[in-house]
């Protein structure tokens, strides 16, 4: 191989190294936002659970006529990093807009397109057995204890049910949502 060819190959290799380094060095930039809340509490809510979304599914209007109800949908609030001392009970209190569509323990559901309240249907939230609770009324659940220490375990799960409740007449049709807040206290 001639000296010229060897020099050309070496030069090409060096240029290729610089080119690939330049290509590797190029990239993307962005930002990361880390957020949360430090609260005076014995537990932390699992990050995915502090903003719950419960998919109630596609519901046939016929099921809700004549005071019908849907099959309850289970949902949970998971707790972690709990440090219990003498606490025995966790009380979860849901609050939201109370429905005028049905008398009872129910929350208003709103049309996601118009923002208007649905007629003849509302949302019930209840304990794991399916007993509905009024807005602002606490749902008690026992703290699961560690048998070795007789103190609450570091991880706890609060179990609930949600379902729709119809009225005598047919409900409005369309996409809906109901928004509530919840607070957990430890006694």
Swiss-Prot record:
Protein induction: Expression is negatively regulated by H-NS and subjected to cAMP receptor protein (CRP)-mediated catabolite repression.
Disruption phenotype: Deletion of the operon under classical laboratory conditions does not result in any major effect on E.coli capacity to form biofilms compared with the wild-type strain.
GO cellular component, one term: pilus
Keyword Methyltransferase in annotation: no
SUPFAM superfamilies the UniProt entry points to: Bacterial adhesins
Keyword Nucleotide-binding among UniProt keywords: no
Signal peptide (residue range): 1-25
Keywords: Signal
An example Gene Ontology biological process: cell adhesion involved in single-species biofilm formation
Domain of life: Bacteria
InterPro entries: Adhesion_dom_fimbrial, Adhesion_dom_fimbrial_sf, Adhesion_dom_sf, Bact_Fimbrial_Adh_Pro
Misc note: The operon is cryptic under classical laboratory conditions, but is functional when constitutively expressed.
Similarity annotation: Belongs to the fimbrial protein family.
Function of the protein: Part of the yfcOPQRSUV fimbrial operon. Could contribute to adhesion to various surfaces in specific environmental niches. Increases adhesion to eukaryotic T24 bladder epithelial cells in the absence of fim genes.
Protein name: Uncharacterized fimbrial-like protein YfcV
Upper lineage: Bacteria, Pseudomonadati, Pseudomonadota, Gammaproteobacteria, Enterobacterales
Gene name as annotated: yfcV
């Amino acid at each position: 191989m001639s000296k010229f060819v060897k020099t050309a190959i070496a030069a090409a290799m060096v240029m290729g190294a610089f080119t690939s380094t330049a290509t590797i060095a190029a990239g993307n930039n962005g930002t990361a936002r880390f957020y949360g809340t430090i609260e005076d509490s014995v537990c932390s809510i699992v990050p995915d659970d502090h903003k719950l979304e419960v998919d109630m599914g596609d519901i046939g209007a016929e099921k809700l006529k004549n005071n019908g109800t849907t099959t309850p949908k289970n949902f949970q609030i998971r707790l972690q990093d709990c440090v219990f001392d003498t606490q025995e009970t966790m009380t979860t209190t849901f609050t939201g807009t109370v429905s005028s569509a049905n008398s009872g323990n129910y929350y208003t559901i709103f049309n996601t397109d118009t923002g208007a309240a649905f007629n003849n249907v509302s949302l019930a939230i209840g304990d794991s057995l399916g007993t509905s609770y009024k807005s602002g009324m606490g749902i008690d659940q026992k703290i699961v204890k560690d048998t070795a220490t007789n103190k609450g375990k570091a991880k706890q799960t609060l179990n609930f049910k949600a379902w729709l409740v119809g009225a005598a007449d047919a409900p409005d049709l369309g996409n809906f949502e109901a928004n509530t807040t919840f607070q957990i206290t430890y006694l």
